[in-house]
Structure formats: C-alpha cells, structure tokens
Amino acid sequence: MRTLWIVAVCLIGVEGNLFQFGKMIKYKTGKSALLSYSAYGCYCGWGGQGKPQDPTDRCCFVHDCCYGRVNGCNPKMDTYSYSFLNGDIVCGDDDPCLRAICECDRAAAICFGENVNTYDKKYKYYSSSHCTETEQC
C-alpha cells in the first residue's frame, strides 16, 4: 500500500496537496518527503495501524488523525495556498476546508522538524507486521 502512496505522489505532480506537504517537509527538515517519510514506521505513508514507533512516527499518527477530522474535504488532493516566511509556514486560505488541510500539513512538517534528530533509519520501510496495537486518535 505504501507503494501506492509513492505512485500517487508522482502522479499528482505540482498540483496536488501531497506535493505541497512534501515541500513543507523539505522546508522544515531539509529531507525529501518521498525518500524519508513515505514509508516510515507504522504511520508515515499510505494508511497506518499499530502504535507509533518513535517521535517521527507519532508526527504521522497525529497527521492522520488531523486529516480524519477534516470532513467534506479531500486532504490528499485539494490544493491550498501557503507561504514560507521567516522560517515558518503560513497557511493563507479563507476557505475553512483548505485552511484546515494546510494546518494539518503545517503541524506535521513542524513536528518532523522538531524531531529530525530522532529520525531512525531502522524504521524506514518498516514492516507493518510489527504494527499491531492500534492507538485511537
């Protein structure tokens, strides 16, 4: 399933939300979203189950929960406006749906940046068979 997420990112190109989220991640971490965060732990990438394995994986868990609270929107596809300003990410939409999606992505990118030093390569391409006890949002 994570492969599908990677393919989706490539197909969306510059118009999709996942591309925008990737740019935010790169801005806050210096890392490629596709290479570093698309298949990490139990929650980074398509889907998610189990217990977050570390602070980075918890960022993805919280992001998934945030997307789950955005009703009536398409968080992985809707395009929103944002800018980078003095080291921060500023969401700029008046549309409540687009703003909520942007804020979810912004919070996750900031979380990745705050936890970049705890990123552990052992969780990259982590087998979902290790992701058993599911946490609730």
UniProtKB/Swiss-Prot annotation:
Active site per database record: H63, D105
Tissue: Expressed by the venom gland.
BP-aspect Gene Ontology terms: arachidonate secretion; lipid catabolic process; phospholipid metabolic process
Signal peptide: 1-16
Entry cofactors: Ca(2+)
Disulfide bonds: C42-C131, C44-C60, C59-C111, C65-C137, C66-C104, C73-C97, C91-C102
CDD domains found in the cross-reference section: PLA2c (cd00125)
Reaction catalysis annotation: a 1,2-diacyl-sn-glycero-3-phosphocholine + H2O = a 1-acyl-sn-glycero-3-phosphocholine + a fatty acid + H(+)
Entry similarity comment: Belongs to the phospholipase A2 family. Group II subfamily. D49 sub-subfamily.
GO terms assigned for molecular function: calcium ion binding; calcium-dependent phospholipase A2 activity; phospholipid binding; toxin activity
Species of the source: Vipera renardi (Steppe viper)
Binding site for Ca(2+): Y43, G45, G47, D64
EC number: 3.1.1.4
Protein known as: Acidic phospholipase A2 Vur-PL3
Pfam family name, one: Phospholip_A2_1
GO cellular component: a single term: extracellular region
Lineage: Eukaryota, Metazoa, Chordata, Craniata, Vertebrata
Keywords for this protein: Disulfide bond, Hydrolase, Lipid degradation, Lipid metabolism, Metal-binding, Secreted, Signal, Toxin
PROSITE patterns per record: PA2_ASP, PA2_HIS
Subcellular location(s) of the protein: Secreted
Cofactor annotation comment: Binds 1 Ca(2+) ion.
InterPro entries, A to Z: PLipase_A2, PLipase_A2_Asp_AS, PLipase_A2_dom, PLipase_A2_dom_sf, PLipase_A2_His_AS
